[in-house]
Amino acid sequence: MTYAWLWTLLAFVLTWMVFHLIKMKKAATGDLEAEAEARRDGATDVIIVGAGVAGASLAYALAKDGRRVHVIERDLKEPQRFMGELMQAGGRFMLAQLGLEDCLEDIDAQEAKSLAIYKDGKHATLPFPDDKSFPHEPVGRLLRNGRLVQRLRQKAASLSNVQLEEGTVKSLIEEEGVVKGVTYKNSAGEEITAFAPLTVVCDGCYSNLRRSLVDNTEEVLSYMVGYVTKNSRLEDPHSLHLIFSKPLVCVIYQITSDEVRCVAEVPADSIPSISNGEMSTFLKKSMAPQIPETGNLREIFLKGIEEGLPEIKSTATKSMSSRLCDKRGVIVLGDAFNMRHPIIASGMMVALSDICILRNLLKPLPNLSNTKKVSDLVKSFYIIRKPMSATVNTLASIFSQVLVATTDEAREGMRQGCFNYLARGDFKTRGLMTILGGMNPHPLTLVLHLVAITLTSMGHLLSPFPSPRRFWHSLRILAWALQMLGAHLVDEGFKEMLIPTNAAAYRRNYIATTTV
């Protein structure tokens, strides 16, 4: 019997040793393959496709960690776009974490201290509140997006291990399901191949590489039409002015010390023509009368139209859920990865949050050539980002739907209830404003606010006296709210939306920290 126990123990030890040796051999083989890849890739650790806010910020962050970065951008001239003109307080904090907050200086950016809302002759101003658990000033920045992008590019290019090049990426280079680099045309028209162990695709909402990496489709929700009124200043230049106009919203805000951006949202299926003057007529006759005369909002809105509208622009508002890219050697970021309605102006904040997370995950790796290790880290990145991204995606989607004017009594009741909830100015409003500003990204807290807005809307519809018709419409409000919320619970994940530990971990690791 004693010998049997000894033989059993010996067999167990030998089996463990064999498995351990096999595991060590596999690890050694993986390291050797990684070293071989590193030798092949030569002077570049990361190729970044696109040098917008996301691409330029990521290039700087990775280069500061010692990575050799090659950035390929289609057009290095200053972008002339009117999206991405509000950096929320949470986004400013992320820039500070990356060492990039000085890029908001010297671009004539304006402080964004509050949201002003207007509906049917009533208005309220909702300041971004002080939050003791948010280690930064609760103030955003209103700005010219192109100026910010140029500052970020300059900051990235100032590092010796960043190569910023103008060129158009044509395709990704793949070998056995692993992305090894890109093929691109440089500014001289030469076709070049570039290799790196990691390629990051962040070439924006019109990405031509995304469809080869993820099975995802974008949805066009509406169009934003915008122009700049020059030599003007709002009486309240530190608020984002949101007008509950019909059929969709208008937004007015100060982007420089003497320029005001005016934006009107129009339905995707009925956008007036800009070239033949229909748009000017639409803005002047349909939208301008809905702009409140409070302050000088309507005056500035009309001034821009009457001065000839030299640079009226339109852009599609899009929505696209984030999807895991299962190919190794590549990551998708920014608007190429995840989009939401711009009503809460938080796209840049989500992208910068993603960059902070990704930088921290990659930082411990001595090199990026072990694609399995990088792939495993990227899978965890998709989970860690959820508190910020799910909160913003859900809030943007539901707000954009609720603020659509309609003759439907239930939906109009929800729209009025939303205004009433925001206009209260109590602790509930302050809590929602910390979420809007990115100071408290917490999906469960957002869900509770949405429930409260729904109940407020139902109460508004039932007062002063309930009737069978009003009761029926209040039930329709509840059903619609559950439908909207349920869609996001499915899309973002029940666990990620409803379990508070994920949000607590995100806040502990990425907000309650000191600037690096």
Curated annotation (Swiss-Prot):
It is a multi-pass membrane protein. Its EC number is 1.14.14.17. Its cofactor is FAD. The chain crosses the membrane at residues 2-22, 43-63, 435-455. Its main location: membrane. Catalyzes the stereospecific oxidation of squalene to (S)-2,3-epoxysqualene, and is considered to be a rate-limiting enzyme in steroid biosynthesis. The gene is SQE4. Keywords: FAD, Flavoprotein, Membrane, Oxidoreductase, Transmembrane, Transmembrane helix. SEQ4 or SEQ5 are unable to complement seq1 mutants. This is Squalene epoxidase 4. It comes from Arabidopsis thaliana. The keyword Transmembrane helix applies. GO terms for biological process: sterol biosynthetic process. It is found in: Membrane. Belongs to the squalene monooxygenase family. GO terms for cellular component: endoplasmic reticulum; membrane. Pfam families: DAO (PF01266), SE (PF08491).
